Amino acid sequence: MAACGRVRRMFRLSAALHLLLLFAAGAEKLPGQGVHSQGQGPGANFVSFVGQAGGGGPAGQQLPQLPQSSQLQQQQQQQQQQQQPQPPQPPFPAGGPPARRGGAGAGGGWKLAEEESCREDVTRVCPKHTWSNNLAVLECLQDVREPENEISSDCNHLLWNYKLNLTTDPKFESVAREVCKSTITEIKECADEPVGKGYMVSCLVDHRGNITEYQCHQYITKMTAIIFSDYRLICGFMDDCKNDINILKCGSIRLGEKDAHSQGEVVSCLEKGLVKEAEEREPKIQVSELCKKAILRVAELSSDDFHLDRHLYFACRDDRERFCENTQAGEGRVYKCLFNHKFEESMSEKCREALTTRQKLIAQDYKVSYSLAKSCKSDLKKYRCNVENLPRSREARLSYLLMCLESAVHRGRQVSSECQGEMLDYRRMLMEDFSLSPEIILSCRGEIEHHCSGLHRKGRTLHCLMKVVRGEKGNLGMNCQQALQTLIQETDPGADYRIDRALNEACESVIQTACKHIRSGDPMILSCLMEHLYTEKMVEDCEHRLLELQYFISRDWKLDPVLYRKCQGDASRLCHTHGWNETSEFMPQGAVFSCLYRHAYRTEEQGRRLSRECRAEVQRILHQRAMDVKLDPALQDKCLIDLGKWCSEKTETGQELECLQDHLDDLVVECRDIVGNLTELESEDIQIEALLMRACEPIIQNFCHDVADNQIDSGDLMECLIQNKHQKDMNEKCAIGVTHFQLVQMKDFRFSYKFKMACKEDVLKLCPNIKKKVDVVICLSTTVRNDTLQEAKEHRVSLKCRRQLRVEELEMTEDIRLEPDLYEACKSDIKNFCSAVQYGNAQIIECLKENKKQLSTRCHQKVFKLQETEMMDPELDYTLMRVCKQMIKRFCPEADSKTMLQCLKQNKNSELMDPKCKQMITKRQITQNTDYRLNPMLRKACKADIPKFCHGILTKAKDDSELEGQVISCLKLRYADQRLSSDCEDQIRIIIQESALDYRLDPQLQLHCSDEISSLCAEEAAAQEQTGQVEECLKVNLLKIKTELCKKEVLNMLKESKADIFVDPVLHTACALDIKHHCAAITPGRGRQMSCLMEALEDKRVRLQPECKKRLNDRIEMWSYAAKVAPADGFSDLAMQVMTSPSKNYILSVISGSICILFLIGLMCGRITKRVTRELKDR
């Protein structure tokens, strides 16, 4: 190829090639050309000249349609005189063209179709109207590829000689100067080239994209096809790649062993060797640098017309007709069309392979794509994406330029729409076929073979690898994971979901239904899809593809274009971030976003907050990440071991995070901190829990819409949900989610945002080193109670903390699981006695109270303590407050929380009282009467009386054991004796009155007389409304009672009723009218009204009501009997019994005799003590 001369600079074709290209500008569209030709020109005007230059064309023909200069005419005359038509020669040495000889036949120029070696092939293959046109015949023959139309070896050799001669005549440059005259003038670089060396034509080819002159551009493009049919005709290519062809075994370099015009296979082989080298970490065979440049330059020069890539042209000719029939050739349009159909089922494998090779070359050098290089030329220059500035290897050139331009777009710079369109196409191309990314091939080869074999189309391999990274199919190496992350950044599918074909196809139906209000290609489409994750509108395949992509987007905040646009200023200011296409080895995955969300929830006092727009985006991302722990890089990284250890069976949506929260105390420190911080964040903005919000949407809309609409949550929404957890509209999923969050809050007081903000200073001061919320609540509550009881001038707990503390206390009463100590103590009892009872609404606690006598000792003690607390502060009695909610509003709207139960008891017998509430009040009264400690008012009023009169009972009682009403019974007896203090007497009177109406309020009576009540008073006990009939029944049947303890209790009742008529409801009802008439002026209490009635009964002038008179007589008879059989309670009772006894004389005689005998013994036996002298006594 020495005839081509020296190449002046790298990547240029020979001057002879460019002479031919420019010369061809004078030719018109050749007859017989296919429907996809480049265009039309002056046609046969140059046919004679081509024949002449080619070594056989006729002489003496002019070029009528070119502007004829005197120089051009002189050149033509010289050629006519010196040259005669000559037949084609056999292959000649590299030193120069074949010898010319005359003999052209009369009357016409030399015709390729008339040559003996090609005549048969031309007649068989080419249409008849092309035979007179050498260029048409040449194009026809070199485009033949079908086996049945194989061209003979002699004809191939003739064609090659013909083309070679066309490329080696130095006189073509002068013709090119005429054809491209105006173009050369416009392109200064080409006008300055020296004349006669072929450099000017080489320059024109370099600037082919800038040629606007139609004639010049069309013919350069047209005639290039001749050269690209054989690598040996491309000047310099043979010299640069000779050794590589041999090493790679790309075919013979000696003519004759292959079809001369089909040597494009050699270029294809070299291209494959080049891309294969990039895909191997330690390639066995390396393409030389000179040949690499030559290969890429040839690919670049063939980038506008697929006819110029001979291998691809022949491999894809049928596919072009099938898929791109209406696509006009030129400017790379056919390439792009074929790329778009690359994964069609009907695409031939050989064409798909050729297209893939072409795409891999584009990945190595963006200029191999004509459309991309042309559309983005000005933008690349504008944003300094120059190749010379590349910090990375040549293999990354396309990806680097894409990222450079994407960075400009993300910074809000203007990039032309044409360039952005091209970028979109090539980003989609990289996502569709993993093999176009050498880094993926290098880093993920093993993973692809092991996990993703057979998934090579439409981006399925990349999504398969993404699935592996998510941990669904195994483990992925760090190098592969990093390569995937880099590819995702290069393709930037977050900016336009259509880039990810697998995602696009899987989610098309969801987008059409759920996201149809968002324009196609908008970045918010992905966000919309995330919002509909795990909803009825989401399909399974879309769900998987979406989460696989989001896994990588979540690890680089820059890959969410909306977040980046709204937060890049804040990130730069607060988190010291780099540019979009810059990375830092010192900044771990997710670090920027972690920084952003830490600042997002800062208060104004803490300073350095995010802008409102950025905060909204951070919240959006947090809401989306809550869907899946794998979307939180830090969480998955730090908690990988714990997830496997504790949560391997938790596979449903959202269960993994809940599992980690449930095992918070068991997690390793780093994981515990991450989960704790996330939970603390959720407490401030529960909307981060997107799944919970979705489940609770009806409740939020009906009851919490006011707080839900607030941009700043601050824990209000969760508080509202807790308050409305038992509404009829509440669904099971929402209730479970809210309860779970409450349970998690118990683990650390920081997890209750409002509580933390209100009480953090108090906790530091009063409860240091306490972490669990329940312990903090107990600590603060105890402090508040002590200050209240001691009537401290100033509370140690601040007012705002006391208010929030009350909210927390009330919330904890709703579910036994919210009181961990009680729950742990009673777990076995719950299983034994309350297994059929559901949690929530304090139902388990109520069940334990009802089975209190059967509980284990530890649980019984805890329940008793709980009841003691509830009685001191009835507002903490969840069941009472729930059942009596409306009655409290009706009867006790102004009542203090401490006196709430007292108020309800006072209104218990009102006609307006709700039966269910009345029943609940009675239950609490029964509880109170079992132990004086459960009645705070009695305890306070009788503080001095209890130790004085009931000391023996207190001494025998064990700590934390119930007294079963013994102390209250003791006080009742003292009440009858009128020995109690006035405050205590008032409280005991109320208890006696209440228990007289309902026997269940007297625990001692119920304990000792249960059998008698069942046998003697079953009908009265079964009555729904207790009005004292059971007590009356027992009094009437006193003589039938055999059990001494029961008889004693009934006698005590009689004794109590004698002390005051109010404690005998039956008598009081019967004598109510008489009391009004005869005893109205008598002050109640201390038996005064009873004495009044007795006097009225004895006074014959007073006529009492018959029922009252009958009841009074019955009572006198009962009291008389009681006086006889009742045991003496003290010395006075004993003396009275002796004096009223029928055997009092006998008793007194025995007592007197005993005294006399004792006296006589003293007289007879003398003194007992030893006698001593007076001196000793006086000393």
From Swiss-Prot:
Keyword Protein transport: no
Major subcellular location class: Golgi
Changes after translation: Fucosylation is essential for binding to E-selectin.
Glycosylated residue positions: 165, 210, 581, 677, 786
PTM-bearing positions, type Phosphoserine: 961
Membrane topology per record: Single-pass type I membrane protein
Keyword annotations from UniProtKB, A to Z: Cytoplasm, Cytoskeleton, Glycoprotein, Golgi apparatus, Membrane, Phosphoprotein, Repeat, Sialic acid, Signal, Transmembrane, Transmembrane helix
Region (Disordered): 32-112
Localization of this protein: Golgi apparatus membrane; Golgi outpost; Cytoplasm, Cytoskeleton, Microtubule organizing center
GO BP annotation list: bone morphogenesis; negative regulation of protein processing; negative regulation of transforming growth factor beta receptor signaling pathway; protein processing; regulation of chondrocyte differentiation; transforming growth factor beta receptor signaling pathway
Leader peptide range in chain numbering: 1-29
Stretches assigned to the Cytoplasmic side: 1167-1179
Transmembrane regions listed in the UniProt entry: 1146-1166
PROSITE patterns: GLG1_C_RICH
Low complexity composition-biased segments: 60-84
Source taxon at top rank: Eukaryota
Record topological domains on the Extracellular side: 30-1145
Cys-rich GLG1 repeats by residue range: 116-149, 150-212, 215-278, 286-346, 347-413, 414-473, 475-537, 538-604, 609-668, 670-728, 729-788, 796-856, 858-911, 912-979, 980-1035, 1041-1101
Tissue spec: Widely expressed. Highest levels in pancreas, skeletal muscle, placenta, heart, testis and ovary. Also found in the kidney, liver, lung and brain.
InterPro entries: Cys-rich_GLG1_repeat, Cys-rich_GLG1_repeat_euk, GLG1
Molecular function GO terms recorded: fibroblast growth factor binding; signaling receptor binding
Compositionally biased region (Pro residues): 85-96
GO CC annotation, single: extracellular exosome
Function: Binds fibroblast growth factor and E-selectin (cell-adhesion lectin on endothelial cells mediating the binding of neutrophils).
Protein name: Golgi apparatus protein 1
Source organism of the structure: Homo sapiens
Gene: GLG1
